[in-house]
């Protein structure tokens, strides 16, 4: 290991570890020495690392984002959080059963290993994924946008955030009653499933939708630019009529693009009318 200024700083930080945490983010280093056996938290993101040494069995947190890594070593069974975005990773190792958070977006991944039953947060956007394993029942946050996915598995009843933008999806599975955020623009969707009453944010722009299901009373934002929509609600009211009486409900603004006799929604936002 060359002993440049940042390497000296690295060795100094390793020798000074007191709470099990090693933060070497942004250091200009290409390799690491043997790591302390008591290490619990390792942040080596935004470095020039191309390989990691054996990871301590005590490790619970690993951040290696924005590095030159293309392979990860065996992950310790104690690991709870793994952040490996923006690297050249094409395969993930076996994931420990303790894992709660996995961030592996902006990588070369084409498949995911079996997901642990403890997983709560999953970011796998901007990858080559075309199929998903079974989703754990504990999952609350899923971002699988800008992938090759054409179908989603059954969604867990705990899910609150689903982002599946710019995919090959033409249909969505049943949405859980806990969902508050649905982001599905740039897809092949022509119909949406029943929307949960908890939904506060919906983006279905750049889809083939021609009608929306009943909108929840909790909805705060609705983006439906460049769709085939002519009706906002199931009572048959046209967009043009609806926009004339926006203050009767909670509509902040409705942007209308007219094409002859047709109206196309550009953006539709909701807010609490009491704010005026």
Question: Which residues does each predicted region cover?
Answer:
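Canonical leucine-rich repeat
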Residues: 32-35, 52-55, 72-75, 92-95, ...
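Polar/charged alpha-helical tracts
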Residues: 9-12, 16, 37, 57, ...
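Intrinsically disordered, low-complexity segments enriched in polar/charged small residues
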Residues: 18, 73, 85, 93, ...
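N-terminal capping/linker segments that flank leucine-rich repeat
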Residues: 1-34, 39, 228-276
């Amino acid at each position: 290991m060359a002993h440049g200024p940042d390497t000296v700083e690295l060795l100094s930080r390793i020798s000074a570890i007191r709470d099990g945490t090693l933060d070497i983010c942004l250091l200009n280093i290409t390799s690491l020495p043997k790591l302390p056996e008591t290490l619990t938290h390792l942040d080596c993101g935004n470095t020039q690392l191309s390989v990691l040494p054996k990871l301590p069995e005590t490790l619970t947190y690993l951040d290696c984002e924005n590095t030159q890594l293309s392979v990860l070593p065996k992950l310790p069974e104690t690991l709870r959080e793994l952040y490996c975005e923006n690297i050249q990773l094409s395969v993930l190792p076996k994931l420990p059963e303790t894992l709660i958070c996995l961030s592996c977006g902006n990588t070369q991944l084409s498949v995911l290993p079996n997901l642990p039953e403890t997983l709560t947060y999953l970011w796998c956007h901007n990858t080559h994924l075309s199929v998903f394993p079974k989703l754990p029942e504990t999952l609350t946050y899923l971002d699988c946008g800008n992938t090759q996915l054409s179908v989603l598995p059954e969604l867990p009843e705990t899910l609150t955030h689903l982002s599946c933008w710019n995919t090959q999806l033409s249909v969505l599975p049943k949405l859980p009653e806990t969902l508050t955020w649905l982001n599905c623009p740039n897809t092949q969707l022509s119909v949406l499933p029943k929307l949960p009453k908890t939904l506060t944010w919906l983006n279905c722009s750049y889809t083939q939708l021609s009608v929306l299901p009943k909108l929840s009373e909790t909805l705060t934002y609705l983006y439906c630019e460049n769709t085939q929509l002519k009706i906002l609600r199931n009572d048959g009211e046209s967009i043009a009529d609806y926009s004339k009486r926006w203050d009767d409900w909670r509509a902040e603004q409705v942007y209308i693009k007219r094409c002859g006799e047709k109206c196309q929604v550009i953006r539709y936002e909701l807010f609490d009318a009491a704010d005026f």
